Amino acid sequence: MVCGGFACSKNALCALNVVYMLVGLLLIGVAAWAKGLGLVSSIHIIGGVIAVGVFLLLIAVAGLVGAVNHHQVLLFFYMIILGLVFIFQFGISCSCLAINLSKQTDVINASWWVMSNKTRDELERSFDCCGLFNLTTLDQQDYAFCTAVCKSRSPTCQMCGEKFLKHSDEALKILGGVGLFFSFTEILGVWLAMRFRNQKDPRANPSAFL
């Protein structure tokens, strides 16, 4: 059978959804592992990653069941949801690639002061730095209460903002690139689901509609 046939479309859609399932399980597993080892204590971060993993897993299961059973309703909603996810993810990925250092500084500064003291302390110890940018009285107070190891080795520590900026540009490019890649796999999933949904099952009753 040629690759444009019913079986090929079905197998391709199943394979794509198996990949989505593995990615969803990986996200859930990594979040649980990070929480178990104490690498990340913020319940909001862990909960967000797990929620994304569960959401991706549910979409993949719906797509897989729809593909295996040639279920018209499931495939329709799968196409709609995956299309909406593509629009959202494509926009976020483009934003990650377009953000400049000035915007990154603003985002880091705003994020730093909405974090809990515990989260800031963990970041300072993890990156071995103290304070953010030392631009305000609050920054100086934050530096004074820092518990990073670098304070015991030298009279001054590198500011955390400098280290964050150094890594954030690379991280944003990686996130943007990975996001764009998955965005195009989602478009592929929508196209495969639409194509497969409109194909007639050769094993079905010849007089039945699709």
From Swiss-Prot:
Protein name, UniProt field: Tetraspanin-31
Glycosylated sites: N100, N109, N117, N134
Major subcellular location class: membrane
Membrane-spanning ranges: 13-33, 45-65, 73-93, 174-194
Recorded coiled-coil stretches: none
Record-stated family: Belongs to the tetraspanin (TM4SF) family.
Membrane topology qualifier: Multi-pass membrane protein
Location relative to the cell: Membrane
Residues in compartment: Cytoplasmic: 1-12, 66-72, 195-210
Extracellular side: 34-44, 94-173
Organism per entry: Bos taurus (Bovine)
InterPro entries to which the protein is assigned, alphabetical: Tetraspanin/Peripherin (IPR018499), Tetraspanin_animals (IPR000301)
GO cellular component, one term: membrane
Key words, A-Z: Glycoprotein, Membrane, Transmembrane, Transmembrane helix
Any single Pfam family the record assigns to this protein: Tetraspanin
Gene giving rise to this polypeptide: TSPAN31
